[in-house]
Amino acid sequence: MPNWTSNTLKVKGNKSDRDAFAKSMADFIKDKVKPLVAEWVASNPDKCRKEYERSVTPKIDFNFVIPMPKELEGTTSPRPKTRDEIMQLAKDHSWDEESLKWRLEHALSDEDAARLDELKSRFGYDNWYEWCIVNWGTKWNACHSEDCDVVETAQMTIYRFSTAWSPPTPFVHALAIAFPKLTFRLEYTLEGESGKWSMTGDPEKYEGCRKALKEQNERLEQAAIKIISSL
């Protein structure tokens, strides 16, 4: 399980602009929620239907402004090794026969390797994890529990939600670009760390944020490869 980051996103601006933002995101999310089976709806109280909709309808969806390519869904990180790569690694490792056999049996096929190469060429990444870290700032979409909600005040709209390990800074930058009339203030709390940002529609800041996360992710990836190669 990850360390969870508690996020509070404060959206400030004219009420009409905030309402337009809230409606556009709610409509996007609503289209993704799987409807209940008609027979179930007919045989259960209305409060059950409302509870279902509440439990499966998130308040925030990062795909709203930064959609993850569907082709990356179900991919694996880090990328599996091909048979040739495994045999090359075996020269520098004292794997026993069973260990080497297992690795070869689970090796990446040439066909799958070509498919992953194509994904990386198209999207910059061949797996969902690395793409999410750089484009969303966290490995999963926004996570919601009973303490996650939306609060409306006269001055702002407040969204509370959780993310894994880190705050979704690139997502908030992208919101600010998509809705330049609004100001987005993200406050987060992680174990031993907290922070605040106020963001407006500045594309350069968004690209700078993505670049920093990309460089960080590449460093982590190289460290992970060294660890995995030593096993």
Predicted features and spans:
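Intrinsic low-complexity, intrinsically disordered or marginally ordered coil/linker segments
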Residues: 1-231
